[in-house]
């Protein structure tokens, strides 16, 4: 099982102490996001290889314990969790770090940009960090040229600390989206994608689209944020002589967008508990 921490709120930013208490007790109780009276108990035991036996034909029989194949953290501010990451030594994990350069009027309660960039660099010493530049939106004072300028600044700042950047465009229909924020027009999208794909390549980043397709002409391919292949790579690094595969299912979870390629996961967050107060909230 892949644990999602969390699409619904920013646990690293606001609830890191709570999260590690759940790890210590070995399980977490998760209310159903729709039917709150329904509570799921989710075990939190890291996947471990307990024993490997090899028969006369050279075939390996592997005994595995634990249920968590990996953890995906979603955050805009991992700083409160940075001094606790040693507690994750038995788990495989990576971070999806949303890092934009929007003004305080849009991303109200985030730390200063330079501080968030520094946190990104520190975090990258512990685990893979995937940069999310999303959602891309336009409003008064923020147009396609603004995005190109800010993206270049961020790309240069993060060069060498990550290799992947996931993008998506604003979804205006989300209930948390301010009516003054808009999705770029077709020609604005074309200009943005043309420019940032070149900037990314120059600085060692591969841009990938989250739940969107049709950008292959820019060298931008669809991708999955919750990616079993990343965990297979991490597990293979630890157990080099074993071919470990993360369990995959093709079925989508409720709420996943049409073009979302994420593998199923269990999310342990709760809606309406994030205090960033972003004016485009997509939780």
Where are these regions (language model features)?
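Conserved Radical SAM active-site core
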Residues: 1-107, 113, 117-122, 283
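A C-terminal junction/extension of Radical SAM enzymes
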Residues: 188-258
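Active-site beta-loop-alpha junctions enriched in small/polar residues
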Residues: 8-10, 76-78, 98-102, 134-138, ...
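Conserved C-terminal portion of the radical SAM core fold
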Residues: 115-176, 195-211
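Surface-exposed cleft-lining segments at the edges of enzyme active sites
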Residues: 102-111, 134-145, 177-185
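Local cysteine-cluster metal-coordination motifs and their immediate loop/turn environment
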Residues: 258, 266-283
């Amino acid at each position: 099982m892949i644990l999602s921490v969390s699409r619904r709120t920013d646990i690293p930013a606001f609830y890191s102490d709570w999260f590690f208490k759940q790890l210590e007790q070995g399980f977490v109780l998760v209310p159903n996001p729709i039917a709150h009276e329904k509570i799921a108990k989710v075990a939190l035991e890291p996947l471990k290889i307990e024993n490997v036996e090899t028969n006369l034909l050279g075939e390996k029989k592997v005994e595995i314990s634990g249920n968590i194949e990996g953890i995906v953290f979603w955050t805009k501010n991992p700083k409160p969790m940075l001094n606790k990451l040693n507690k994750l030594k038995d788990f495989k994990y990576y971070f999806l770090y949303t890092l934009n350069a929007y003004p305080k009027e849009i991303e109200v309660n985030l730390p200063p940009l330079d501080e968030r960039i520094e946190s990104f660099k520190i975090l990258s010493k512990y685990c893979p960090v995937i940069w999310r530049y999303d959602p891309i939106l336009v409003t008064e004072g923020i147009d396609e040229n603004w995005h190109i300028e800010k993206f270049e600044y961020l790309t240069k700042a993060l060069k060498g600390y990550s290799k992947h950047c996931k993008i998506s465009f604003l979804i205006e229909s989300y209930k948390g989206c301010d009516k003054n924020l808009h999705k770029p027009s077709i020609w604005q999208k074309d200009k943005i994608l043309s420019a940032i794909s070149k900037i990314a390549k120059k600085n060692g980043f591969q841009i990938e689209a989250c739940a969107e397709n049709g950008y292959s002409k820019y060298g931008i391919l669809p991708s999955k944020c919750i990616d079993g292949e990343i965990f297979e790579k991490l597990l293979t690094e630890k157990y080099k002589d074993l071919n470990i595969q993360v369990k995959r299912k093709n079925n989508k979870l409720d709420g996943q967008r049409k073009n979302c390629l994420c593998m199923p996961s269990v999310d342990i967050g709760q809606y309406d508990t994030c205090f960033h107060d972003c004016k485009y909230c997509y939780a």
